[in-house]
């Protein structure tokens, strides 16, 4: 088994952060498209459930590759999954919260404009920072707190757009959307930090932890599926309304979820939030190049704030020990 905090290269960390954020940006756009088209609307709860199944299968395959032999693979599953009901119960907490978060994200995107969703969802950054301080007993400097809130303001400006008429008229409930996004923000902060605490508090394999979480996640999401849409699913079918675009959204959600666990393992949840915000800026720039989107003053200012906030957060914290020792020495000299 790998140690709880393995030393990995900076390139690997940057690679994981980059892939995760690019996938997240594509996921938001694709998800919004599938929820606002005039076609038959699929059940979002079934998509969340299928995503959990795919992530479980991929994690099982990666654990098999990590163990290197069928015997060690079976032993690992027997010891850490089948023979560890307490660990399964421990990992059921984030899976339950993540399931709620995913369903709230679907609900919010169905009732809010994509830009409004992205802006309000950035509140997960200070929420995650607060959970990190409270749950992991870490401290953030004043400069880091400033950078966290500066990032929220920057992303808001980047995505600020005047109200426009959409081609597809969809019935929306903004109040319901904002309520859903508030729950999603709280779930994101708590579940992410809780999972980080579990990952880094033992030497258990990342893929074992994922399997433990996704097993309970499948049970939770499957139950939620039939509690929410059971009658309609029985009438129309589990895969009602599914298209290639819907399967693409599920694929993006699965890949993004796996990369997120790797990022949490080797960096932290706050860095994950900063990386996601940077991806929003990059995706907007790509829209300028590909689709002729006009750069606005608010975007330029917001992008600058995002870059500055990332730089400020990444600055090494000043070691005050030597300064305090020097001050104490001077006081002693003066006293003499």
UniProtKB/Swiss-Prot annotation:
It is a multi-pass membrane protein. It comes from the Eukaryota. The chain crosses the membrane at residues 10-30, 46-64, 88-108, 115-135, 142-160, 176-196, 210-228, 244-262, 270-288, 297-315. GO terms for cellular component: Golgi membrane; membrane. The keyword Iron does not apply. Ubiquitous. Found in all the tissues examined including skeletal muscle, brain, heart, liver, kidney and spleen. It catalyses: CMP-N-acetyl-beta-neuraminate(in) + CMP(out) = CMP-N-acetyl-beta-neuraminate(out) + CMP(in); CMP-N-acetyl-beta-neuraminate(in) + AMP(out) = CMP-N-acetyl-beta-neuraminate(out) + AMP(in); CDP-L-ribitol(in) + CDP(out) = CDP-L-ribitol(out) + CDP(in); UMP(out) + CMP-N-acetyl-beta-neuraminate(in) = UMP(in) + CMP-N-acetyl-beta-neuraminate(out). Residues 31-45, 109-114, 161-175, 229-243, 289-296 are lumenal. Changing residue 184 to Y: Loss of CMP-sialic acid transport activity but no effect on CDP-ribitol transport activity. Residues 316-336 are annotated as: Disordered. One of its GO terms (biological process) is N-acetylneuraminate metabolic process. Changing residue 256 to N: Loss of CMP-sialic acid transport activity but no effect on CDP-ribitol transport activity. Changing residue 260 to M: No effect on CDP-ribitol and CMP-sialic acid transport activity. One of its GO terms (molecular function) is CMP-N-acetylneuraminate transmembrane transporter activity. Keywords: Antiport, Golgi apparatus, Membrane, Sugar transport, Transmembrane, Transmembrane helix, Transport. CMP-N-acetyl-beta-neuraminate binds at residues 55, 101-102, 117-124, 188, 210-214, 272. It is found in: Golgi apparatus membrane. Transports CMP-sialic acid from the cytosol into the Golgi apparatus, functioning as an antiporter that exchanges CMP-sialic acid for CMP. Binds both CMP-sialic acid and free CMP, but has higher affinity for free CMP. Also able to exchange CMP-sialic acid for AMP and UMP. Also mediates the transport of CDP-ribitol. Monomer. Belongs to the nucleotide-sugar transporter family. SLC35A subfamily. This is CMP-sialic acid transporter. The gene is Slc35a1.
